[in-house]
Amino acid sequence: MRFAYENADTYLRWKAGTYVDLQGDAADELDDRIDEFHDWHRKNALPKYVRLAREAALRFDDGLSRPDLDWGYDALRGQARESVRKAAELAAPMLDRLTPAQVAQIERRLQDDNRQFQRDYLRGNERDRRRKRAKFVTDRLEDWVGKLSQAQMEQVREYAERMPLLDEWRERDRKRLQGEVLAVIRARQARERLPELIANWERGRDPAYARALQSWRDQYFQLLVDIDRSLSPEQRRRAHGNLRRYAEDFEALAAR
């Protein structure tokens, strides 16, 4: 993690360049704004990550409950809002100066992203997509606790089979937000409107999708509580060690 964080500014410069071509003073300004965001994040966000990781480890030691998962979800979403708002504030003045050709370049890249989303999440029949969902959840859990038992894998499989597929809704919601952002940029109103729009990405979401997401979250959190109850001592030690290492990494990065 430390290596990735220390090189995040380089990645952001490369990523931004895949959306819009900036030259000369504009490219220099982008570099300065990325550096400013990275410095802000190190100073303001990382210390909060340290506290969150330590609190999560304490809660995990006592056994996960639904309130614990709600706390973690709300805390992470709050941190995401702060970061994307700051990023939008820094990017907005540059976005307001883009030419129509540059805005069109961003739109084309978003269309490419949407085609990739379709390949990643909408390809295949329902059975294939549910199998892919089960593998994704299994892989993420094993990142934290190590190899799952057969009983735990069966719990994941049952969850993947039971829950509705939301990817079509996700695709529509992505396009909704993209359209709103592009409209703000075209109107040259990024400074006035973009930070609030980005930080509240769920506003304007289809109410049916919002309800489906809440149902998914309820079922997923129940799966996590059930898996937690079945963890072996070794699995629990591994997960606790991961949380502790995250806290140590965040603390070391914040101190630089």
Please annotate each region the language model reported.
Residues 23, 99, 149, 232-233:
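Histidine/glycine-enriched, metal-chelating micro-motifs
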Residues 1-19, 77-80, 84, 88-92, ...:
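Extended, structured, electrostatic nucleic-acid-contact surfaces
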Residues 4, 13-14, 171-256:
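A cross-kingdom marker for long, charged
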Residues 62, 66-69, 123, 127-130, ...:
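Alpha-helical rod/repeat scaffolding segments in eukaryotic adaptors/tethers
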Residues 2-101, 105, 109, 243-246:
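N-terminal Sec/ER secretory leader and immediately downstream segment
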Residues 37-41, 114-117, 164-167, 247-250:
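A short hydrophobic/aromatic micro-motif that marks alpha-helical segments and, especially, helix-coil
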Residues 89-204:
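Extended amphipathic alpha-helical interaction segments
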